[in-house]
């Protein structure tokens, strides 16, 4: 299944705020659809399956990943020792495109993915053009020398609501470099999500 490329505010009206998808807020007060409920009237889906599906969709749309990619991360999280839900989130947060977003290089994860795809981002002084690249503790993320995207990134850092990166990252404003200090803590996540419901959604696969 390919990534969603349709109206972003339509998705946030249905699922709530998704900081990785868009920073914009919809002025409409109803959910999408001809007979959409007001946003304050509760969720449209009331079955247990529907609630789990909605949480899964939040994860997919926020990080801009396909169904196959998400299932791959689920399997990898199950394989590792620890709390599966937290490991899943840490895998997604350690993606290079997510880290570029968290450092303030871009206003959305999709925009950060473009920076990576076009070869503007370096990890430990090497150009990495794979958005799903899994960063490791100690990795240094920066901008390629003489990259035309540097001015865009500098402008993004000034214009988007970026004050400081999450605690597992440090950022050098002079060098425009970030360092991965640790795995993310659950409390740092901006996304309103119940990851346990996502794990339950895939429990029979």
Curated annotation (Swiss-Prot):
GO terms for molecular function: rRNA binding; structural constituent of ribosome. Coiled coil: none annotated. It is found in: Plastid, Chloroplast. Its main location: plastid. GO terms for biological process: ribosomal small subunit biogenesis; translation. It comes from the Eukaryota. Residues 15-44 are annotated as: Disordered. Residues 94-158 form the S4 RNA-binding domain. One of its GO terms (cellular component) is small ribosomal subunit. Keywords: Chloroplast, Plastid, Ribonucleoprotein, Ribosomal protein, RNA-binding, rRNA-binding. The keyword rRNA-binding applies. Belongs to the universal ribosomal protein uS4 family. Part of the 30S ribosomal subunit. Contacts protein S5. The interaction surface between S4 and S5 is involved in control of translational fidelity. NCBIfam families: PRK05327.1, rpsD_bact. HAMAP family: Ribosomal_uS4_B. One of the primary rRNA binding proteins, it binds directly to 16S rRNA where it nucleates assembly of the body of the 30S subunit. This is Small ribosomal subunit protein uS4c. It comes from Thalassiosira pseudonana. The lineage of its organism: Eukaryota, Sar, Stramenopiles, Ochrophyta, Bacillariophyta.
């Amino acid at each position: 299944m390919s990534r969603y490329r349709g109206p972003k505010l339509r998705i946030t009206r249905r699922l709530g705020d998704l900081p990785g998808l868009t920073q914009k807020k919809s002025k409409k007060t109803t959910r999408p659809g001809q007979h959409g409920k007001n946003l304050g009237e509760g969720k449209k889906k009331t079955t247990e399956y529907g609630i789990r599906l909605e949480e899964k969709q939040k994860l997919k749309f926020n990080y801009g990943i396909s169904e196959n990619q998400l299932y791959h991360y689920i399997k990898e999280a199950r394989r590792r020792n620890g709390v599966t839900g937290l490991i899943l989130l840490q895998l997604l947060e350690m993606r290079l495109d997510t880290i570029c977003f968290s450092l303030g290089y871009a206003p959305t994860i999709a925009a950060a993915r473009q920076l990576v795809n076009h070869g503007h981002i370096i990890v430990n002084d090497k150009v990495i053009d794979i958005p799903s690249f899994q960063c490791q503790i100690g990795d240094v993320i920066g901008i390629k020398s003489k990259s035309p995207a540097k001015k865009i990134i500098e402008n993004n850092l000034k214009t988007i609501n970026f004050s400081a990166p999450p605690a597992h990252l440090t950022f050098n404003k002079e060098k425009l470099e970030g360092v991965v200090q640790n795995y993310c803590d659950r409390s740092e996540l901006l996304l309103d999500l119940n990851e346990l419901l996502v794990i339950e959604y895939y429990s029979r696969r």
